[in-house]
Amino acid sequence: MRRRKQQPLKTIQAVAPGYVLRFDIPGLPYQEPAFSSIRQRFSGEEDPDVIGIAYLLTGEEYERLLQSEGGRDGGYLEIDIEVKPLADLTNENAETIKCKSLSTKTPRENPCPLPSARYMSLIRGGAAEHKFPAEYQEYLANLPIYTISSWRTEIGRILFLLVWAPIVLPIFGLQAAFGKGGKVPGWIRWLQIRVFKAMWFAHDKVFSPLFGPGDITSEKEKLLRTVSKGS
């Protein structure tokens, strides 16, 4: 919140029962492959309930927050969830709090892309700063991050960014300039969707086969291919 220059009226540590942390929002391959969101836990998933900070914001501050995340028509989807204060988890009669949170409209899954070390350090740092439970901090510490493990992939990263960064980055500038009141103009959203689809198509069909993936590590890719061949 500090980096967005927002002043919440109140903050509490909270857990969202039945929801898990996911990195299923595609970003910029090779550089910032994924951003986080939350979604309901699927059957068989063992990830812990997501823990975070619940902020009490004014209507104006909330709209500013939405704008900073791409607006209502951006990649995020507003969802209504119920959370419990961490301090009251042992109290079965503790009241739940109704909150707004952000999920993703078009998740990239099977597999989900991995977050960068920079992005993951922000999440881990926030968990440490707010003194989240040690078990949850350990869970975050063990989540994998995207790494470039070969010179071939590094060459692919440089070439990919030379082509796509000058196209993608101005879109975020347009969102900041025209996304007033938490709403992004339709023509910017239209442009963003098509540019990102084209960018990820180029990654999946051209750059990844030639240079290695820009969203998962080579080790994870090998494991997925092995499982696929065995199935």
Spans of model-derived segments:
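Glycine-aromatic micro-motifs
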Residues: 1-231
